[in-house]
Amino acid sequence: MVKETLIPPSSTSMTTGTSSSSSLSMTLSSTNALSFLSKGWREVWDSADADLQLMRDRANSVKNLASTFDREIENFLNNSARSAFPVGSPSASSFSNEIGIMKKLQPKISEFRRVYSAPEISRKVMERWGPARAKLGMDLSAIKKAIVSEMELDERQGVLEMSRLRRRRNSDRVRFTEFFAEAERDGEAYFGDWEPIRSLKSRFKEFEKRSSLEILSGFKNSEFVEKLKTSFKSIYKETDEAKDVPPLDVPELLACLVRQSEPFLDQIGVRKDTCDRIVESLCKCKSQQLWRLPSAQASDLIENDNHGVDLDMRIASVLQSTGHHYDGGFWTDFVKPETPENKRHVAIVTTASLPWMTGTAVNPLFRAAYLAKAAKQSVTLVVPWLCESDQELVYPNNLTFSSPEEQESYIRKWLEERIGFKADFKISFYPGKFSKERRSIFPAGDTSQFISSKDADIAILEEPEHLNWYYHGKRWTDKFNHVVGIVHTNYLEYIKREKNGALQAFFVNHVNNWVTRAYCDKVLRLSAATQDLPKSVVCNVHGVNPKFLMIGEKIAEERSRGEQAFSKGAYFLGKMVWAKGYRELIDLMAKHKSELGSFNLDVYGNGEDAVEVQRAAKKHDLNLNFLKGRDHADDALHKYKVFINPSISDVLCTATAEALAMGKFVVCADHPSNEFFRSFPNCLTYKTSEDFVSKVQEAMTKEPLPLTPEQMYNLSWEAATQRFMEYSDLDKILNNGEGGRKMRKSRSVPSFNEVVDGGLAFSHYVLTGNDFLRLCTGATPRTKDYDNQHCKDLNLVPPHVHKPIFGW
């Protein structure tokens, strides 16, 4: 909590002699200053009102007593007037007797006055007994004077007029001398023993003598303001102290760890009652430490013998003091919340986002749209959010976004222009950082926390190995009922091209097996070009943008009318990095330069290796025309007849599928990544460099065949979604959900494989929690948690608040 220093207000009409330092101290807003000043002044008035109300009540009680006494005297005189004996003019002896009787009553009145502490109330009461009573036959003036004289000898005090106070408070300017006018007329001696009133009166007199400028100029240094500032400081201090909850100490942390690890300890033979005794011993150790502390807080903490409840209360107090929201333990979060009937939730987590035109940005977006189109499940697409400095490095044409909402609007607009319907799914962002060395985006922090527990049902991890290399968070299979991984990239092929690539590929191969087994229930490989991962099957679950199929239909109609559909030759399109097939392309063109003759190839692409690629092509004097990168659906690319893709690092080239959908020839390598495309007649594969030349010449001299409806359907996202539902087992899961038998994690005894998977996940969690090991294995610095810029952009709670207790 950020504190604001409280500074008293200062008048804008200060004299010119006011120093610059004093004016600097009055820069706080007048609204805040006047608010607490008015509050302090209101407290003074409330306190004075309370005292005056008490005085008024006491005065009224004695006044009522005097009125009662007055009525008794009147009754007495009336009864005397009705008596049979005539009442004549009073004699001196009768007056003496009456005075004697009243003097006997006087101690009782003094007793009332002392009990109720009403200053000069007796004088006021006796003033009501005027000479008018003489018309009844008795002159009581002598009685009044005698009683007053007796009372003045006992105590002299003044009386505050309540009505006068109320009138002065409503006037424009309060004159405190008039407030005490009656007291001044009666004499200063009446207030001689009433110290609070005398002190207050002198203060008000001094205050009235000052001018407005003197009051305002001296107000900031007044004792009242200093005390008020001290009071506010004490209030803020008490608030901070109240929120300052001590962190969990070592015995409490160990007890908490033992309780959370009960399922794991049960698997290795440690019974629950043994765990309870360990927790109890640790709590007793904590209690013994508290006994040594001579404080009331310690005695309060050890009053309760229920150690389990005590530990829960301590953890709750620490979490509440930090604002952390706890969703469950590492081992105990097995039972997921119930989902609405016939409605499941699918979260798709990917490693890239538009406007970066890469496969992991485009394909998950289409998958989310077509899964949401089925309306059987709600869908959330979770994409990385990059800070502006990283956006400038990744997104083309210097395109940047100032907020996630702005980027989400761009993504939805781009998608709706291509699919032709409004996709009803949610887009969420997680913090990400771009690595220049790896040319990839890596998650920062626990990605799973950006999917709420109530929506944690089915997770689809696009590139599960990439997402989990340095993942340090809750295990995906513990938070979600079913986790499917989709392998997009052949990372081993990329790594082999680097320095010491064979050694690095060996370790990465085992790490990929490790993380996919620990965090996935099912793994889908787009082609056999990827490594054989645990729990994996090969299936192409990608489709093409409907716009490409429409282009293919349009070209087929033009050809049916006898028009020339293709007026251009061959082209290649892809990100301009060596691993995307540019090395193979230049080698093939350079080796068979003479056989290809005047064959020209237009190359579209942007990338980090653009300068080196163009330099290599120029060195071999190749007929390559390098052009700026374009969207594959751009009108400028419709008239090309042949698409050449010599890449063998792709898992499943999206551009190849798009070219086939547009009715073009495709010349590609005979490689597992192209296995899905071999069934299409327009796909020409080659095994050798000589075969490459013959396939290029064949494509340039012939016309491609139009696609059949079945072939077009196999390339569509509808077919890809159907294949995905089948091979990921989602159709079985969703059908079971519709039948009322939802798949749920349970606390039943796990199998041996599940125990091994849990151990792998736990060891990975421990190792990725060490910053030194992360840096040694190539992690992007400061990706264990998101940074302050991510907190500002995504309105996140700082990591030290989100993880207040402990971490690995």
UniProtKB/Swiss-Prot annotation:
Annotated region (Disordered), positions in chain: 1-23
Induction: 6-fold up-regulation by phosphate deficiency.
Listed GO biological process terms: galactolipid biosynthetic process; jasmonic acid mediated signaling pathway; lignin biosynthetic process; oxylipin biosynthetic process; photosystem I stabilization; response to temperature stimulus
Iron as UniProt keyword: no
Gene Ontology, cellular component aspect: chloroplast outer membrane; mitochondrion
Cell location: Plastid, Chloroplast outer membrane
Keywords: Chloroplast, Glycosyltransferase, Membrane, Plastid, Plastid outer membrane, Transferase, Transit peptide
Family label: Belongs to the glycosyltransferase group 1 family. Glycosyltransferase 4 subfamily.
Official protein name in the record: Digalactosyldiacylglycerol synthase 1, chloroplastic
